Amino acid sequence: GSGNYLLAEITPWQDVTEMEIFPYTESISGKSFTVTMKRFVPAREGIRYDRVFSKWAVVKVDGDKQVLDSHARYADEVAPKASPAALPLRNKKGFGAGDTDLYFSDCKEMNVGSITMNVVLNNYITGEGSGYSYGGKEYSLGPVKDYVDYVTQKASETGLVVSAIILCQTNSIFKDPENKGGNYTMPNLTTAKAFNLYAAALEHMASTHCTQGNRISHWIMHNEVDFANEWTNMGDQPMMRYLDRYIKSMRICYNIARQYDQNASVLGSYTHCWTVADGNYAPKKMLEATVAYSEAEGDFRWGVAYHPYPQDLTKPSFWVNDTQATYSLNSKYVTFKNLEVIDAWIRQKENFYKGKTKRVLFLSEQGTNSPSYSESDLALQAAGGAWAWKKVSKLDGIDAIQWHNWADNKAEGGLRIGLRTFAEGSVSNLTPKPVWYVWKAAGTAEEDSVFDQYKTTLGISDWDCILNTVE
């Protein structure tokens, strides 16, 4: 159109929809244009800035204002620094986070293909100091750096695909200025200095663990963002403002990790809610909005890390109790009962990466509970594990399931969702539960001989009858 137009560069610490003046611009003219600039800015707001993190928009000059005239767009391609071959999943079976010798022994004995790993970022990089340089700043590395080295090394010995869960504790250097508590915070991305700290931690981790050996293959960004106030707190926000920040966090990680591994995905973390917002937001709406963001700002390989716990985490009989987990794309919940729903959603072409490639879908945290260590409660838990595996093994949209927890944990509010016990009464610590044997048999020649004893508990005569068509 007629008038004076500029190409505006928007940094991660700027909110494009709230700006009236864009400080970083280039003049443009004509219906099409080419602008060439250096990738690195030696000094911008106190840091050495890499434009790989910027998005770009056309703005129209209107008097003393600059009016947004297009969607902002990220770079479609980032030049790789390394190109390792993909580390394939050998099967769908996995474990949630663990780090002991017995844990890795179980990984090998059960032939699991994948694990998760919690990374508390404020203990990976502890703030400005010495030892690591990024963006013109010096930082100190913390003890979690050695922990990540250890877990990824152990995982590489048996070919495990590792997904790192990126967490920022609330009272830490990463605390968002609008945070109001919760277990974890949305990382602070409101200033150049705060952004640089976050990017520094991810850059160090990716440059160390995205190439051959000691590999992180996927990045689960924060935890259960639909329950934002509890698990990734940014204060009380409209969904789209919260999601905009979350997508920025995902993009920062993505644009770093993909320089070292072109097979990496970043995964959004969600609870068992679907169209209902038991927390702050409904996951289905958040995912649909993320698809829309990708269409407007340029698609990237994001995926889903879903947590299909039973509706009531304490009750193992989800096949009876989960009445609001239906076989509809508008189901209120997605639990072990109706995994077909999220499988159907991820396989819809309108949700594919660039309309061509299915996104990664991991069930990255879930388990059935044994309310006690009685024989009947343990049988209910094991039956639920068998049901879950039978569904996952048949649903092509689900790439892997990481059972949480590997072992029962007394810090989990009375839940006993692990494959092994904690010490209680006559029960020894880390005793394999019946569900341990179910998980070991899953995907092997012994599967049916171990699983079939639980048909009576589930009230079925045939495993095929648990699979349903989504409306």
Show the residue positions of the predicted features.
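A structural motif corresponding to the C-terminal end of an alpha-helix
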Residues: 147-162, 208-215, 252-264, 293-300, ...
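Noncatalytic carbohydrate-binding groove/subsite architecture in carbohydrate-active enzymes
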Residues: 241-375
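Short, acidic/polar
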Residues: 96-109, 198-208, 281-293, 379-391
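Structural preference for beta-strand elements that scaffold enzyme active sites
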Residues: 90-94, 114-116, 159-163, 216-220, ...
